[in-house]
């Protein structure tokens, strides 16, 4: 019995947890069971276990501190500590098995796995070179090709387009000006237009180098051969086959015509009309005559909601304005005229309009008929002074005649101008006359 117990004790691993190898601890489902030890302590415990074990007779070098900072030493440590279980596995898999996915390792491509990425910056002079100055398959070479792919290429055939003394920066400016001109030209016509490149020539004049600019017009064949524009830009600029087959001089003339928009002489005919209800306006007690908005605000200060007054507008394009109290404030609204109708917004057909001003004021007396943005004219502010006899006579005369009928009255011209003061003009027609051709 004693011998059997001794033989069983030899077969059973009775070593403490800390002295076991990691392969024995992995049976629990966790890589490092027990206490969480540092890398140095783990390597020491693993090395002790390996020396005790009769299967693995290799010696472990005493360089555990250097193994923490080197990926190759970590791989060697994992191979010695874990035995034949990790043979044939990559470094990433071994680290994942060892750490237990506590620290996820970022996927790296083969391009970046050669070493740590370089922190060196690419100089602008290196980007101007035609060939990559960096070693192939390096990080700097990858960045150099990436930047070159996402920037505008410089065509080797650019000598046909620009002069030989043009610098690289001036060439890029010319390309930007070319695209800007194409956008401006495309606004005037739906047909395609051949693009033009604006180049700068160095001159020895007073303005210094780069002051003169020449517009070189290229044919479609040279555009197709050169790689300055992408295929999409060529398709959008050259959609018409007839346009491509035209001679160069015809294309040049059409470009010059499209660059200068057509000019027209516009003649607008107006009809002048007197205010239709000037007499009723003058008899209305809410009409205060000539008054600016500051005087109106002083009169309306402290008045209840809906109090209003009618006055002459301070702007020449409008005849009358209303000042009213709403939302505890003094507000102002101009009365506009369009097609012999008066409203507070002549360009909106949904806003109420009336053929006379008195009818417009009557409509906005009802609060239920007023929108929140429209004036509320429920309580008129009574005028406290009478008008002059001259003004009253003018309203009576204008009520009996028309604007053209005033010219037939046997009165002085100064009085005719005084009678025509309250009038508006309505647009009748618009005539567009072509501009005469300019002869050089």
UniProtKB/Swiss-Prot annotation:
Any one GO BP annotation for this protein? positive regulation of proteasomal ubiquitin-dependent protein catabolic process
Q: Does the keyword NAD apply?
A: no
For region Disordered, the annotated ranges are: 1-29
SUPFAM superfamilies given for it?
SH2 domain, SOCS box-like
What is the disulfide pattern of this chain? none
Q: Where is the SOCS box domain?
A: 376-425
- Per UniProt, residues of the SH2 domain are 286-381
Keyword annotations of the record:
Growth regulation, SH2 domain, Signal transduction inhibitor, Ubl conjugation pathway
Identify the Gene3D superfamilies for this entry: SH2 domain
Compositional bias (Basic and acidic residues): 12-29
Task: Note the superkingdom of the native organism.
Answer: Eukaryota
The record's section on InterPro entries has: SH2, SH2_dom_sf, SOCS4/SOCS5_dom, SOCS4_SH2, SOCS4_SOCS, SOCS_box, SOCS_box-like_dom_sf
What ranges does the record list as Polar residues composition bias? 1-11
Q: In which pathway does it act?
A: Protein modification; protein ubiquitination
The task this protein performs is described as: SOCS family proteins form part of a classical negative feedback system that regulates cytokine signal transduction. Substrate-recognition component of a SCF-like ECS (Elongin BC-CUL2/5-SOCS-box protein) E3 ubiquitin-protein ligase complex which mediates the ubiquitination and subsequent proteasomal degradation of target proteins. Inhibits EGF signaling by mediating the degradation of the Tyr-phosphorylated EGF receptor/EGFR.
Q: What note about domains is in the entry? A: The SOCS box domain mediates the interaction with the Elongin BC complex, an adapter module in different E3 ubiquitin ligase complexes.
Q: In its UniProt entry, what is this protein called?
A: Suppressor of cytokine signaling 4
């Amino acid at each position: 019995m004693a011998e059997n117990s001794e033989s069983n004790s030899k077969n059973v691993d009775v070593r403490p947890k800390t002295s076991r190898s990691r392969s024995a601890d992995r049976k629990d489902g966790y890589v490092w069971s027990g206490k969480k030890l540092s890398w140095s302590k783990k390597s020491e415990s693993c090395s002790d276990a390996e020396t005790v074990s009769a299967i693995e007779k290799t010696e472990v070098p005493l360089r555990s501190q250097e193994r923490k900072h080197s990926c190759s030493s970590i791989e060697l440590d994992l191979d010695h500590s874990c035995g034949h279980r990790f043979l044939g596995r990559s470094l990433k898999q071994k680290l994942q098995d060892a750490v237990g996915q506590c620290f996820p390792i970022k996927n790296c491509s083969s391009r970046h796995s050669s070493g740590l990425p370089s922190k060196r910056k690419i100089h602008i002079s290196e980007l101007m070179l035609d060939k990559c100055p960096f070693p192939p398959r390096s990080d700097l070479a990858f960045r150099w090709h990436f930047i070159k792919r996402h920037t505008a290429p410089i065509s080797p055939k650019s000598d046909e387009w620009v002069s030989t003394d043009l610098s690289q920066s001036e060439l890029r400016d010319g390309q930007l000006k070319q695209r800007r001109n194409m956008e401006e030209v495309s606004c005037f016509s739906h047909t395609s237009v051949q693009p033009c490149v604006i180049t700068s020539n160095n001159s020895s004049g007073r303005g210094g180098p780069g002051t003169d600019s020449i517009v070189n017009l290229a044919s479609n064949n040279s555009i197709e051969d050169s790689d300055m524009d992408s295929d999409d830009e060529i398709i959008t600029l050259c959609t018409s086959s007839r346009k491509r087959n035209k001679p160069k001089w015809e294309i040049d003339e059409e470009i010059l015509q499209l660059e200068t928009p057509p000019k027209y002489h516009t003649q607008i005919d107006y009809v002048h009309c007197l205010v239709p209800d000037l007499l009723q306006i003058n008899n209305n007690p809410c009409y205060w005559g000539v008054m600016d908005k500051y005087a109106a605000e002083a009169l309306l200060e402290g008045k209840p909601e809906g109090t209003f007054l009618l006055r002459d507008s301070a702007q020449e394009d409008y005849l009358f304005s209303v000042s009213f109290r709403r939302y505890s404030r003094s507000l102002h609204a101009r009365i506009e005229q369009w097609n012999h109708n008066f409203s507070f917004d002549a360009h909106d057909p949904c806003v109420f309009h009336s053929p006379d001003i008195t009818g417009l004021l009557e409509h906005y007396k009802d609060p239920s008929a007023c929108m929140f943005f429209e004036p509320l004219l429920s309580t008129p502010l009574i005028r406290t002074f009478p008008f002059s006899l001259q003004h009253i006579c003018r309203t009576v005369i204008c009520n009996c005649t028309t604007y053209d009928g005033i010219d037939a009255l046997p009165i002085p011209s100064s009085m005719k101008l005084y009678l025509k003061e309250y009038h508006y003009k309505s647009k009748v027609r618009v005539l567009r006359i072509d501009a005469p051709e300019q002869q050089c």
